[in-house]
Amino acid sequence: MTLNSDADPDDPEPAAPARDLSKPASKPARSTRKSSSAKSAQGAEGEPRKTPGRRAPRTPASDYRIAEQPAFVLHSYPYRETSLIIDVLSRDHGRLALVAKGAKRPHSALRGVLQTFQPLALSWSGKSEVRTLTGAEWVGGMLPLTGGALLCGFYVNELLVKFCAREDPHPQLFHHYVVTMTRLAHDEPPVQVLRSFERVLLRETGYAMALDRTVARKAVLAEGRYVFDPERGVREAADDLPAQWPVIAGQTLLDMEQDDYHRAQTVAQSKTLMRFLLNTYLGGTPLATRQILIDLQNL
């Protein structure tokens, strides 16, 4: 059953949050029509009249309406007195901000549906930075996250908010998000699940590089010692390289390339490497949930 948003048709769409603005608002085109007296003057002077240009066809209203799109809620925050703005990851449209009008009302059908870590089918309309949610359906089929798995889920959601630009679809990343939530719900080792997701996230957003070959196109050797240049990739360890680049065993890099985390050394060094890379690519911006995980579970 699809639950319709309690949207009031006369309510305006909210302005985009300031931190998410990436495109200047378009300005209405000025009228270029000339008065009849001006046209007559042109005719009198013998200048040829210009044929009015054809107007660009209007975008069909259906292009601004999306129905039953697979999606997950990443984050939500209050908007006005009775509404929410939800940050969602959708399969075919990437990360979007939607206003759920009336979702905070006591008897709103949306209150129990717009939950994190649950597969949803969302419908929305509009073309502004913040679309209007018009319907939400709980799809089901996934176990809820609890305990440490719940903290890991919030960490994954925060990474998506930090790394994924608005309206930049990543179907493979969406698929891996579903896989990650399923693995966490089934109590698979969090370290392996998180490292696997982090690598997919970096690859899909344009940061990841191969771990089994160096920048000099040499094969990584299990017994070798290496560092990871954030701009170029794996390099052989040397004294003249930046001290903040962690030294990683070749075996760790090979294990990570194969998504294999059964060795204790690989678990420890992969955590150090990924923490360094995420911090570098985020420009030093701290991850709130990462610190919680470090404090509580030392992940």
Curated annotation (Swiss-Prot):
Give UniProt keywords alphabetically.
Answer: DNA damage, DNA recombination, DNA repair
Native source species: Paraburkholderia xenovorans (strain LB400)
Q: Which Gene Ontology terms of cellular component type are present? A: bacterial nucleoid
Please give the name of this protein. Answer: DNA repair protein RecO
Q: What biological-process terms (Gene Ontology) are attached? A: DNA recombination; double-strand break repair
Question: In UniProt terms, what function does this protein have?
Answer: Involved in DNA repair and RecF pathway recombination.
HAMAP family found in the cross-reference section: RecO (MF_00201)
Coiled coil (residue ranges): none
